[in-house]
Amino acid sequence: MDAYREFIDPSKVNNCVGCNFISSTKKNLIVGKGSLLQIFETIQLKQSTINKPQYRLKLIDQFKLQGTITDLKSIRTIENPNLDYLMVSTKYAKFSIIKWDHHLNTIATVSLHYYEHCIQNSTFEKLAVSELILEPTYNSVSCLRFKNLLCFLPFEVIEDDEDEEEEEEEDEEDEDEGEENIDDTKEKKDKKQSKTDTIEEDKNSTTTNQEPRLFYDSSFIIDATTLDSSIDTVVDMQFLHNYREPTIAVLSSKQEVWAGNLIKSKDNIQFQVLTLDLNLKSTISVFKIDNLPYEIDRIIPLPSPLNGTLLVGCNELIHVDNGGVLKRIAVNKFTRLITASFKSFQDQSDLNLKLENCSVVPIPDDHRVLLILQTGEFYFINFELDGKSIKRIHIDNVDKKTYDKIQLNHPGEVAILDKNMLFIANSNGNSPLIQVRYRDSSKTSDTKESKLNKIEEKEDNKDDDDNDDDDEDDLYKEEEEEETQKTISKSHIEFLYHDELINNGPSSTFTLGICSKEKFKCNLPNPNYNEVSILSNAGTDSQTKLNIITPTIQPSISSSLTFSQVNRMWNLNQKYLITSDDVNYKSEIFQIEKSYARMKSKHFINNELTINMHELNNGKFILQVTPKQIVLYDNKFKKRFTLNDEIKDDEILSSILRDEFLMIFLASGDVMIFVINTYNESYDKIEIPKLLDDTIITTGYITNSYLLSAVSKNVNLLLDNNTSSNKRKRKHSALSNSEGSKKNTGKSQPSTAAPPPPPKVNKVKTFVLVTGDNRIVAFNRFHGEKCYQLNHVDKFTENLSLGFFDPNQSTVDPFIKQIMLNELGDKFDTKDEYLTILTIGGEIYMYKLYFDGENYFFKKEKDLTITGAPDNAFPYGTSIERRLVYFPNLNGFTSIFVTGVIPYLILKTVHSIPRIFQFSKIAAMSISAFSDSKIKNGLIFLDNQQNARICELPLDFNYEFNLPMKHVDIGESIKSIAYHETSDTVVLSTFKQIPYDCLDEEGKPIAGIIKDIKDTPAMSFKGSIKLVSPYNWTVIETIELEDNEVGMTLKSMILDVGSESGSTLGSDPNSLIKKYNKKKREYIVIGIGKYRMEDLAANGIFKIYEIIDIIPEPGKPETNHKFKEIFKEETRGAITSICELSGRFLVSQGQKVIVRDLQDDGTVPVAFLDTPVYVSESKSFGNLLILGDPLKGCWLVGFDAEPFRMIMLGKDTQHISVECADFIINDDEIFVLVADNNNVLHLLNYDPDDPQSINGTKLLTKASFELNSTISCLRSLPLIDIEESVQTDALTNIAVPPPLPPNTTSNYFQVIGSTQDGSFFNVFPINEAAYRRMYILQQQLIDKEFHYCGLNPRLNRIGSIKLQNNETNTKPILDYDLIRRFTKLSDDRKRNLANKVSGKGIYQDIWKDIIRFEHTLNDL
C-alpha cells in the first residue's frame, strides 16, 4: 500500500498559444507544461524607457489538470466574439473547450469532447497522442486526428447576409459538380457515435424561457481515405488560411520509403488541398501534387500577406501557393541524393542546414518567415513579393548579433503576442520571450507601427459600425497593407530578449547529496548542516544546467548573537536591538553600532515584557507596547507621552502599527485605534463603527488596499435584489440573450464583453478586524458607520465576497490567530494583494484580491504547502508560537515570515503563485528586518536555543517552484551524476557532439561512404568526466574521454579494498574474519560505452577513480581535490549499468553482469549472471539486486559471498520494458517500483509466502499507476515518520527536529523519481489503516468534486493500463495530489466528506494522515 506525490511541478513548456482569453484588448500567453496549465500576461516594467522598453511575463493563475496536455488552440465563438475560448487537448483523444469566468476569476469548462472509445474501436493500433487542428480564418471547424482517423467538430460562425446569399448560390452550383460524398450509412452511424461520445456542459445560461443555442454542431468521425481515394497514410494535415470555406492540406504517402531503399524508390509523398463541405460531409479537390521527397513531414500554413503553405523536410523547403505553384529550395547536399527532381530546386545547399525539429514562425505582417533550427540558429525565409504574388524565395542567415542573448535548443511551438512579441517553447532549455524590432530609423519604425495601427482601427470601426461600406474598407485596407509591405521590406530586424520561463527538464538523472557540510557558521550550529539535496540535470548541449534542489532556504549568514534568555526581538532603524524576556519579565536595549552594548534609559520600561516595538516617522520616534503601557519615545529613548489612560485596567494582547495608525487588542475583546501625530506629539482616537461595540475582537490589521474602493462609491453593489443579480449574471455570462434571434438575422449581437479594468483610484487606508466568531470585518478611516464583512470566511470557502456586517454574533470559538492583507511580489511586480490567514492549528490560507468588473473579491490559493492542521491533529507544528511577520523588502521580495518550530517564508515571484518554503530545520521564535554594512534588506531571527543569526535571502536561488533551486551552467549535456561524500564534491559524466569519423577497427574508412558530402558528416559524441566543487559550483578538473566514448553511468561507492589473507575457513573461528578484513573506501566507478556505427561492435571500459586531497591553487580554495585513477579495464560490450553490491561492484557489460572484488593490485571477478538482452537498470539493497531488462522485465537476484554466487529469486512475468527501478521497503515487506516506457509505474512484490508467487519465483504485480510524463530516474531514500522524528530538548522542554542526518536506522524506504518534463515525485509506503481512510476519501473526491476541463482523475491514472493480473490494482497506488485537495475545500465540505469515510474522530485522523504524507521528505 503506497501513495504517489508530485512535490515539484512540471516546467517544460510543451504547448503555448497567445490569445485574448481574459481581455479583449490585451493578449494572454497560455502555456501547457505536462499536466499544468498556466495563464500569463505581459507587463511593462517601471524602469522601462521609450527607447528600451522592458517586459516580463506575469502569472495570472495556474491549474493542475487530470491529464496530459497535448495541444492548445484558441477559438473565437458566437457565444463571445470579444474573447477567445481555449481548446485544451489531452491524452489520448479528447479535448475540452474552456473560457475565463471573470466573476469567479478562474477557468470554466464549456464542453468536453471525448473520442477515445470511438477511435479505439475503429483501429487495431494502441491509442497514442492525437493532434488537434483548427480552421484559422473563421474558426468554423476543428479536427482531432489520430493517424488516418479524423474527428471533425463544426462550429457556428458569424455570417453576414451577403455571405448567406453567396452560399446559397454556391450550393446551387455545387449540385452540378462532381463530389466525393461520404457513405450515408457511415455518416449516420458516426453522427450517433459522436452524440454519445460528446459531453456538453452549460452552466452559464442567462435565458430562462429557452435553452441556449450551442456554438458547435454534432461531431463526426471519418477515415482520411474517404476524403480522396488517392490518400493513403497521412503524414500531416493542416487547415489553410484565407479560404472562404474550410480547406485542408494533406501530406500522405503511398509506400514506405526510407534512406536504405532510396535506390529502389524515391519521391513517395503526395500533397493535396481539399475544400470541406461540412453540411454534406464531402470534399472538393483544389489541386494535387505528387512525387515529393520522402522526408517531407510537415505542413506550415502561411497567413496573409504570404498565403499558401510551406512544406518542410529534413533537407529542403517547398512553398506551394494557393494555385499549386511550387518553389523549391535545397538546403544541404543530401537533397540531390533523396529526390529525382533536384533540377527543379533552387540550390542553397551551401547553407548545410538540418531542418529536423526546426521551428517555422511567420512574422506577423511581414514578408519574412523566421526559421529556427534545433541548435538555436536563426534564418530568414525571404519572400520577394510583387503585389500579392511571390516572385522568389530564398533563405538568408540572420546575424548572430541580433539575437546573441537568445539561447534555444530544440525549439517547439511559438506564441504570437502583442507589441511584436514572440514566446518560444524551448524543449531542452529555458523558454524565452522576445520582441521583433525593426532596426531602421525611428521614422521608418514609427511609420510601420502607425500604419498597422490604422489598419487595426479600421477593422475595429468596421465591426462596431454596421452602416460602413465593406468594399470601401477592404480597398483602403489593401492599399495600406501594400504601403506597409514596402516599408517593412526595406527594414532590418533584431530580436530583443525580455524574459524567460525556467525549464527544469528534461531531467534524465539525479542523485542525492549534501550541499552544506559545515557544522558551524559564525560560531553557531549551521541551520542547513547535512541537509540532503537533490542534484539533477536540466537542458542539453549549451543550455545544460546542474540543478541543486534544497529542502529549505539556504540563508547567507553574516554574523550571530547569543543571549541568556530572550523570547522576542526587534530591530529599530538599524540602531537598536530590543529584546524581551517573557519568562523573567524583562526588556533590554542593545546598541547595534556599538557592538551590541547594553543601553540604559531611565524612561524605557525594562521591568515588563514587551509585546511589540514600532517605529514612526522613519525611526525618529519609537513606540513601546507592554501589557499595561504604551509609551512614545524619541530616537534617544526619551519619553514624549503615553497612552496609558486609554487602557486603564485592561491588558494589551497585541498591537499593529501602519504609518501613523496604531491598533491595539485588549484582553476584554475590545480594540482601540489611534492616530499618532509625531509633529505635535499628540494622538487622537479613531472610533470604530458602532455596530462593532458589542462584538468581541481578537486580532486585526491595518493596510492600504483596494478592497473597499468599489463599495465606498456604490454601496448598491452589495444589495441582494433580483435586478443587480441578473445584471451581474448577464455581464459575466458567456451566453447572450440575443442568441435566439441569430437564426433569423444571421448575425450575432451578444451582450457579453470582457469586464472593465479596475478603476484607477488610489488605495485607501483600511482597517481589518477579526471577531470572536471568526468573521473578518473591514472599514475605512472615514467609515460613516459603514462596516463590511467577508462572507463565509469562517468556512474558508473558495471565493470571499463583501457583505454588510451582521451584528448577530455566533458562538465565540476563535480559531483565526492572525491575518494580514498586503502586497506580495518581487522587484518586477508587487501589485497583487493577498489576504493571509493563520489559524491556531498552524494552517495558512491565502486569498488573492481581484476585480470582477463591478467589485473586489477574494479567491483562495489552492496549491500551497500544508503547514498545520485543525483539531490539534499536528501539535508538534504549534509547539512554538506561530506568528506572521511582514517584510516590505526582503532582498527585493515583499514577503511574509512565519515563526514556529518549523519556520516558513512566503514568497511570490512574477512567474509563480505564492510559495511557502520551509526556512530552516531549526526553530524560529522571533524575527525582524535587519541591514548593516555586510548585508542589505536582510533579517535577524532567534531560535529556541537563544541564538540569533543575521542573514539575507540568497538571490542565486530560484523561488518559482515548490522547493528552492539553484541553477549552475555546465555547457555540456549531462549523462550521469554522483555525489562523493568523503570529499564533498560532485562528479558529472558529460558529453558533447563531434563530427563522426567513420573508420573500422583498423582505422581504415568503411566502404560505402559518400565522398561528396564530407563537409556535412554524421555526428557522434565525446564524453568527459568533470569534478565540481560545491564551494562555488565550478568545475575544478576535467578528464576527457576518447572520441565516441561516453560515460554511460557513474556512481560513488564504498568498496572493500585489500588483499585476501591466507586463512581459510577451518577450526579457527576467526579465520573467516581475517579473510575478509578489508578497508572500506569511497571510490568513483565509471562505466563507459564506445559507440560507433551499426557495423562495429559497441565495446566498453570501466574505470575506478579516487578523489584525493591536494594543495589548492592560490586564490582558489575550491581546487583542493583531483581525480586519481586506480584501475581500468576494457570489456566486450558497452557498459550500461553499474552498482555497489555488499562492498563489491557489479558491472553490466553486453548481455552479462559480473560482480568484481577490488583488491590492492586490481579487480577480481567473483560472480556472474547472463541476461536476455541488456541491463537497463541495476540497483542493490543489502544482498538483494534488481536487474531491469528493456524486453524481459525485472529480475530480483540474491548475492551470496560464501561461496560467491548469484541466486535468482524472482522474475516479472509481464515482461515490463524497464526504464528504471528501485526498492520500496515497508518494514519486512520487499517491493520493487519499476517505471516502463509507457509512463507507468509498476509496484512488484516479492512474497514467497503467497501461493500465487510460486515460492517467490514470480514477482507479483500489486499496482500500476500512470504518470503524465516519461519517468527518467528512480532513487531510494529512507522514510522517517514525522511523529517519530520529533525529539524534546532537555533544557527547554521544547519539541525540536532530530539531528541531521537521523541516527536511527529506518525500516521504511521510499522512492524519489524524476521525469522528462522537470517534475519530481515520491512514492512511499503507508499503513493499512491510513490506506483505507485515504482510499475512501480519494474515491469521494473523484466522484463528488469538480475537476478542471471536465477530466476524470481515475481515467488519468489507470485508464490506459492493460491489467494482466487479477490482483493488479486491487489496492491501487493513492494519488496524494488529489487527496490534498481535501485540505483546500471549505470547512463544511471537508467535514461532510470526512463523515462519509468513517465515524467518530475521523476528521482528526484524516488530518494526521495528510500531515504524515506532507512530511515524507523530512529526511532531505
Curated annotation (Swiss-Prot):
Name of protein: Protein CFT1
Alphabetical GO biological process terms: mRNA processing; response to xenobiotic stimulus; termination of RNA polymerase II transcription
GO cellular component term of the entry, any: nucleus
Pfam families: Beta-prop_RSE1_1st (PF10433), CPSF_A (PF03178)
UniProt feature, compositional bias: Basic and acidic residues: 183-204, 437-461
Region (Disordered): 161-210, 435-488, 722-760
Cellular localisation: Nucleus
InterPro entries, per the entry: Beta-prop_RSE1/DDB1/CPSF1_1st, Cleavage/polyA-sp_fac_asu_C, RSE1/DDB1/CFT1/CPSF1, WD40/YVTN_repeat-like_dom_sf
Biased composition regions of type Acidic residues, renumbered to the chain: 161-182, 462-483
Main localisation: nucleus
UniProt keyword Hydrolase present: no
UniProt similarity note: Belongs to the CFT1 family.
Entry keywords, A to Z: mRNA processing, Nucleus, RNA-binding
Free-text function comment from the UniProt entry: RNA-binding component of the cleavage and polyadenylation factor (CPF) complex, which plays a key role in polyadenylation-dependent pre-mRNA 3'-end formation and cooperates with cleavage factors including the CFIA complex and NAB4/CFIB. Involved in poly(A) site recognition. May be involved in coupling transcription termination and mRNA 3'-end formation.
MF terms (GO), sorted A to Z: RNA binding
Alphabetical list of Gene3D superfamilies matching this protein: YVTN repeat-like/Quinoprotein amine dehydrogenase (2.130.10.10)
